[in-house]
Amino acid sequence: MKSSQTFEEQTECIVNTLLMDFLSPTLQVASRNLCCVDEVDSGEPCSFDVAIIAGRLRMLGDQFNGELEASAKNVIAETIKGQTGAILQDTVESLSKTWCAQDSSLAYERAFLAVSVKLLEYMAHIAPEVVGQVAIPMTGMINGNQAIREFIQGQGGWENLES
């Protein structure tokens, strides 16, 4: 079954679920249906399970072993100044390109998603009071990137994205 939610709504739900998971690792099961009521008009459940998707994205992020400390601190500093969007996108794009240059078999879109998740996780650990301000810009960054959107939709949607 397809979800009745739009791609944008699904992305928002996934980013918020990841954020909750990173801020409260012991509450992962409790946040399973954080913002995602998933029944289609027929009343049947859909295949969009935010907990599974967030778990796959976490595994994907765990594959990224690049240096995040300086980049994360820069994003945090800009977030405090209210300038999250541009620096977040520049940081994710730069780290993704660097990682792809080191591993020619890695698709840029996978690297982009992995770096995004890992950066969110790292920021949640070192600046939990600020990381919540990154969720909306990160959602917008993913939704607004045509290549990432096409990659996810080419997989059959978020629910078919593999780690």
From Swiss-Prot:
SUPFAM superfamilies membership: Bcl-2 inhibitors of programmed cell death (SSF56854)
Tell me which UniProt keywords the record has, alphabetically. Apoptosis
Can you name this protein?
A: Bcl-2-like protein 15
Q: Where are the transmembrane segments?
A: none
- What GO terms fall under cellular component here? cytosol; nucleus
Could you tell me the gene encoding this protein?
BCL2L15
What InterPro entries does the record tag this protein with?
Answer: Bcl-2-like_sf, BCL2L15
Its GO biological process annotations read: apoptotic process; regulation of apoptotic process
